[in-house]
Amino acid sequence: KLNENWLKTILNEGAKDRPYMATRMPKFGASQTGSLVTLFASTDALGEDKPVTFPEPEHRIKADARLMIGDQALSCIKCHTFDKYAATGIQSLDMTTMTRRLRREWFHRYLLDPQKYRSGTRMPAAWPKGRSVVPHILNGDSDVQIEAIWTYLLDGKNAKVPSGLQREAIELRPGDRPIVYRNFIEGLSPRGIAVGFAAKAHFAWDAEHMTPRLIWHGAFIDAAKHWVDRGPGNQVPLGDHVMTLPAGPPLASLESLDGAWPDGNPRDNGFAFKGYSLDKAGVPTFKYRWNEATVTDTILPFETSPDNGLQRTVTVAPANKLENAWLRIASGQNAEESDGAVIVDGVRFQIEGKEPIVRTINNRRELLIPMTVNAGETATVRIIMTW
């Protein structure tokens, strides 16, 4: 069941993946065991890994896997630890180490029929006779569900913690009015501002970079890290489908579309944060200056399915004519046009009011919107983000 790399580690260096067992593994050394690794692997092999095609983007697949592992579905966390989090029952093997140790095809076979490989095991059969006990997730497809869990666990210790383990959580739940949470947020500068909506589509705006940096679905924020004791460290979004938007100056004047986007601190590029105001519904509008131009940025939920999106409106009002001005809303490895929109690394951007362009610069795909405008006028663009 172990992959070749982990077999080498065990035979050459030893390992302690089961701290609850009072046993020690000798360190034999590579000179004594070098040929055994290949022999073990070839003797136990039962064929090639079968490819599995996912029906959804990977960020949604991982969210479904997280749901399955947590206390709302298969409850793997009742027996298995998850990095630093103890299981709610017996303390079995850490799930975040599994993909580092195991062979993918063995993982599939074992989950389908644990008793076949370990008679008398406490491991329950979640896919008896190949049928899932959670048919409402990923259409009940057993192969897809197991592959989803494997893909989720490939993130190792960086995998998002399943539901049911953070028992001291202080979850902030938006109601009639959005919640504005100003604190240290993972992936942002220390000037992060998270905004949560009852529509379960949320974002985090970075007052250092003058732009939204994170968007996500589901639960909003767990405030326990910052509201208990001295509140050290950064908090990650509590929900799923967390997507990252580019840092750096949001606006730039480019003499040529071949020119690189400015980097460094936006304050060194003529930007100054001017705070935010709340409308009657409690929705913030962020304000900043870019040289002689005033800029506002408002983000609201956008109703769609299967999960709501976000609607962003950016308005630029210059004191003098603004030429060759561009707004950068996305930067990623992949970008493709689809039904009048542009999809960049899993986020779909639909632009209203302007004609965007996609360019390749420094091996990155950037989505830019022209914001050239005369003095005394305004340039406004509406951006609908779904993911």
Model-found features: residue ranges?
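Periplasmic/extracellular electron-transfer cofactor-ligation site
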Residues: 17-19, 46-47, 70-92, 116-119, ...
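Gly/Gly-Pro-rich "capping" loops immediately C-terminal to redox-active cysteine motifs
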Residues: 1-8, 24-27, 83-110, 128
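Sequence/structural segment immediately N-terminal to covalent heme-attachment motifs in c-type
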Residues: 57-82, 144-145
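General marker for long, soluble alpha-helical cores
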Residues: 47, 59-62, 98-101
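Beta-strand-rich recognition/accessory modules
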Residues: 290-291, 311, 319, 323-332, ...
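C-terminal capping alpha-helices of c-type cytochrome domains
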Residues: 6-12, 26-58, 128-164
